[in-house]
Swiss-Prot record:
Residue positions, PTM Phosphoserine: S122, S231, S239, S387
Ranges of residues in domain RRM: 4-80, 114-191, 325-409, 477-582
Organism the protein comes from: Mus musculus
Listed Basic residues bias regions: 679-698
Covalent link location (Glycyl lysine isopeptide (Lys-Gly) (interchain with G-Cter in SUMO2)): K643
Biased composition regions of type Basic and acidic residues, renumbered to the chain: 85-100, 208-226, 598-611
Assembly mode: Interacts with U1, U2, U4, U5, and U6 spliceosomal small nuclear RNAs (snRNAs).
GO terms for cellular component: nucleolus; spliceosomal complex
Compositionally biased residues, Acidic residues: 227-246, 268-283, 291-308
Protein name per UniProt: RNA-binding protein 28
Length: 750
């Protein structure tokens, strides 16, 4: 409980624990309170500790409490937390002893881990030279160059760093580098017993048993230098190369970890580290814990070499997994310590133990841990708080999101490890065609206008007809929105869609376009909206959440004009043609010399973006449907909600294949059982005209249209003829000046 314990200093010798508790209980409930006394007396040593249950009480105590019985006192947040021990030991023991002992134990373990072996070392190199080289990577605590009894060097050395991170940097930086004219090999130093095991494994004809353990548990922390110093002393000066080969046998099987944790030694006995080798299950999301067993007793039991290996395997260890109190933590930082993890978990209840899983060879953290609570309720609280749907977004430690699951037995963990998670292989995503489906007669259809229901039925019929073509697939990220008001533009629609996904993080809309009528539109004028639009999201989860919130929502545009939202249908062939067209245009742009370089760069950037959009659309069909958040938009009007379930179908030949989730089996209005006997009054419809009547009407219309056309043509020709006659008259007889032409007499009448 970091930050919940206060250190109270400058207390008078007469101070008692009950007085201190009475003072601090005025601020809030005190979980623990005691003063540190002198040995053999009740006189206070001048300081004490107070632990609260809530952080708010700690802040109040720091501000309000400044005196104790008239004396001024110092109240600060305690730096170190006392270990969980019984109440009697807390009251009687000295407060400094529980701090010093764990530090001493941890320091030893850390020292042994952050130790490197340097092989192929030059005889001219001294300890000071080595220290000067490795000081660049961190604090060097010790440099040891083993020597023979006659004082000659053996050709290798050990370098001890302060922590594991610095040792890892030195291993990366100094490996295969020259020191005093000789290329050195740097690796992790390994314990003596593991060195022996590696030697036996590398020897020909010797089979290494998996259950082999050291005979004496007290020799576990010994290092390779002990084995090397016990080797034959009658070797020559140039025999250090052979020694390097012996050392390399232990360096090869060791996997290098960047970081590790310091392993605490809790009083409760826990199983040996090598029992957790297969515990980190990445895909199964589960874990196992084989119970609590005393490590020393297990090591002593294995000293008996007469017991066959088969009997050892059959021996079942006691397990506490069935109690439901043990949890398995994954995604743990390699720097996280058991004490810090315990402080995070202790807010849910008292802990029995916390154990970080270490690698059996390097003794570095594997990034996972086990923790057992005293009660099952505390474990359930921890699981609930660790879920991503919790208020705080789960549990975090050292900047990493912790994944917490209930521990399972070793057998169940083996089954989970071998069990393959079958991923859906469908490429058309037909199951998404059902998303948002609303049938007449369902609860979601209540209050929907008849015009909207007619539109939905028409769109559903068109969707079924299009999906009969194998080249058409349902997009996972692109939405098609119908029944939009004419006044809605791109910006307003984008804003509404972002509001629909306000609970999600990192929502990005790649495209949001309202389709418009572009006929007869010139300049900057926008055409009239066609009442539908397309919106493409970056992630399927965000598109699904927006659909479930937006579809049939009466609060957006009113109950009489509800939006109709569905996943868009894409044509694989058209997307390929579009991609080829973009590639051709890019090639043309590259081939043409452009004077203005910035404009060219801008165009290329724009084309690259378009190409990425098209590629993402084409790859969309092959993506496996992701996990959907069922809580998104779970309202009465949102319509049918799909689940990306993977079902198996057994074929006649005995083989199994994935069941393809097809389109909805039921269409049209839903007729409930209670309404089956009732006769519904259908709206009166006009009788459809017969085929003969239709033909007669068409002929009449055609004849009525053709008659005026013929008359118009005849009138035109007659007018043209009259015009020509008039022109000839004017040429022959002269222009008429408004007076009627006089009839001229013939020549023979004179």
């Amino acid at each position: 409980m970091a930050g919940l314990t206060l250190f109270v200093g400058r207390l008078p010798p007469s101070a008692r624990s009950d007085q201190l508790e009475e003072l601090f209980s005025q601020v809030g409930p005190v979980k623990q309170c005691f003063v540190v006394t002198e040995k053999g007396s009740k006189a206070c040593r001048g300081f004490g500790y107070v632990t609260f249950s809530m952080l708010e009480d700690v802040q109040r105590a720091l501000k309000e409490i400044t005196t104790f019985e008239g004396c001024k006192i110092d109240v600060t947040v305690a730096k170190k937390k006392l270990r969980n021990k019984s109440k009697e030991t807390r009251k009687n023991e000295n407060a400094e002893s529980p701090k010093k002992e764990p530090k001493h134990k941890k320091a030893k373990v850390a020292d042994k881990k952050a130790r490197l072996i340097i092989r192929n070392l030059s005889f001219k190199c001294s300890e000071d030279d080595l220290k000067a080289v490795f000081t660049h990577y961190g604090t060097v605590l010790e440099v040891n160059i083993p020597k023979k009894p006659d004082g000659k060097m053996r050709g290798f050395a050990f370098v001890q760093f302060k922590n594991l991170l610095e040792a890892g940097k030195a291993l990366k930086g100094a490996n295969m580098k020259e020191i005093k004219g000789r290329t050195v090999a740097v690796d992790w130093a390994v314990a003596k017993d593991k060195y022996k095991d590696a030697q036996h494994a590398s020897a020909p004809g010797v089979k290494k048993s998996s259950d082999r353990k050291p005979k004496e548990s007290g020799k576990k922390n010994c290092r390779v230098e002990e084995q090397v110093e016990d080797s034959d002393d009658e070797e020559d000066d140039d025999s250090h190369d052979d020694e390097e080969e012996r050392e390399s046998t232990i360096a090869s099987p060791v996997s290098v970890h960047k970081r590790a944790v310091k392993r605490a030694a809790p009083e409760e006995s826990i199983e040996e580290d090598d029992s957790y080798e297969d515990s980190d299950l990445e895909e199964g999301g589960s874990s196992y814990d084989e119970g609590t067993v005393d490590s020393e007793s297990s090591a002593e039991d294995q000293e008996d070499e007469d017991v066959p290996v088969s009997e050892k395997k059959k021996r079942k260890l006691p397990s506490d997994v069935t109690e439901g109190k043990t949890v398995f933590i994954r995604n743990l930082s390699f720097d996280s310590e058991e004490e810090a993890l315990g402080e995070v978990l202790q807010q849910f209840g008292d802990l029995k133990y916390v154990r970080v899983v270490l690698h059996p060879d390097t003794e570095h953290s594997k990034g996972c841990a086990f923790a057992q609570f005293m009660t099952q309720e505390a474990a359930q609280k921890c699981l609930a708080a660790a879920s991503l749907e919790a208020e705080g977004g789960g549990l975090k430690l050292d900047g990493r999101q912790l994944k917490v699951d209930l521990a399972v037995t070793r057998d169940e963990a083996a089954k989970l490890q071998t069990k393959k998670v079958k991923k859906p292989t469908g490429t058309r995503n037909l199951y998404l065609a059902r998303e948002g489906l609303i049938r007449a007669g369902t609860k979601a259809a209540e209050g929907v206008s008849a015009a909207d229901m007619a539109k939905r039925e028409r769109f559903e019929l068109l969707k079924h007809q299009k999906l009969k073509n194998q080249n058409i697939f349902v997009s996972q990220t692109r939405l098609c929105l119908h029944n939009l008001p004419k006044a809605v533009d791109d910006k307003q629609l984008r804003k509404l869609l972002l509001e629909a996904t306000r609970g999600e993080k990192g929502v990005r809309i790649k495209e949001c376009r309202v389709m418009r009528d572009l006929k007869g539109v010139h300049g900057k004028m926008k055409g009239q909206s066609l009442g539908y639009a397309f919106a493409e999201f970056q992630k399927h989860e965000h598109a699904l959440r927006a659909l479930r919130h937006f579809n049939n929502n009466p609060e957006i545009f009113g109950s009489q004009k509800r939006p109709i939202v569905e996943f868009s249908l894409e044509d694989r062939r058209k997307l390929k043609v579009k991609e080829l067209r973009i590639q051709r245009s890019l090639q043309k742009m590259e081939s043409k010399p452009v004077t203005s370089k910035p404009q060219k760069e801008q165009k290329e950037v724009g084309k690259d973006k378009q190409q990425k959009v098209v590629q993402s659309a084409t790859q969309d069909q092959s993506k496996a449907p992701g996990e959907q958040k069922g809580k998104a938009g779970s309202t009465s009007w949102s319509g049918f909600q799909t689940k990306a379930e993977v079902e198996q179908v057994e074929l006649p030949d005995g083989k199994k294949r994935r069941k393809v989730l097809a389109l909805p089996s039921h269409r049209g209005p839903k007729i409930r059982l209670r309404d089956k006997g009732k006769v519904k009054s259908l709206p009166s419809r006009k009788p459809k005209p017969q085929m003969g009547q239709r033909k007669q009407k068409k002929q009449q219309l055609a004849s009525s249209v053709q008659a005026p056309k013929r008359k118009a043509k005849e009138n035109k020709a007659e007018a043209r003829f009259n015009q020509l006659v008039e022109q000839y008259k004017q040429k022959l007889l002269g222009p008429s000046k408004g007076a009627p032409l006089m009839k001229r007499s013939k020549w023979f009448d004179s």
